[in-house]
């Protein structure tokens, strides 16, 4: 069993924001498998898919980003998924828009959702798929207002190309493992 978690903020006002790109990737995965999210046994929405004879739980925490660890730990306990079966999908302000980076483990790198998951698990030993959101054309003055802001039209065009690649990268992790997916997807997309 694999658990793929997309990070974001639950309220409708955050839909389409840069910080919710993890939710966007999970929504694309669910649509690909023609399934819908329902209320889980914890503070999350989940759905189950099967891909190449592998069971996968897709999960969207319904906590705010900075408290994502509670939902992740609850789901890991309920579904009996170990760290090796966990993949977190989140935005990354340190990566330029149009790029993704898969890692087998590592620090939070300034991403507060990852930071809380690491705190709750007491470990950095889980896979993550980081989706770049840093603008190429302007400096940032306020990180929080930027990540909570909606994508510009130009950024949306880039994300429409990136999100399907993220979907395929996540499925590659499920089937072939994180190392294989890193070799295939850790390169610029745009």
From Swiss-Prot:
Q: Where is this site: Stabilizes the basic form of H active site to accept a proton?
A: 91
From which residue to which does the signal peptide run? none
Q: Which GO terms describe its molecular function?
A: peptidyl-tRNA hydrolase activity; tRNA binding
Annotated EC: 3.1.1.29
Q: Which residues form the active site?
A: 19 (proton acceptor)
Gene3D superfamilies under this entry?
A: Peptidyl-tRNA hydrolase
Reaction catalyzed: an N-acyl-L-alpha-aminoacyl-tRNA + H2O = an N-acyl-L-amino acid + a tRNA + H(+)
The record's section on InterPro entries has: Pept_tRNA_hydro, Pept_tRNA_hydro_CS, Pept_tRNA_hydro_sf
Superkingdom per UniProt:
Bacteria
Q: Name one Pfam family in it.
A: Pept_tRNA_hydro
The top EC class is hydrolase
Q: Subunit structure of this entry?
A: Monomer.
Q: What does this protein do?
A: Hydrolyzes ribosome-free peptidyl-tRNAs (with 1 or more amino acids incorporated), which drop off the ribosome during protein synthesis, or as a result of ribosome stalling.
Q: Which family does it belong to?
A: Belongs to the PTH family.
Q: What is this protein called?
A: Peptidyl-tRNA hydrolase
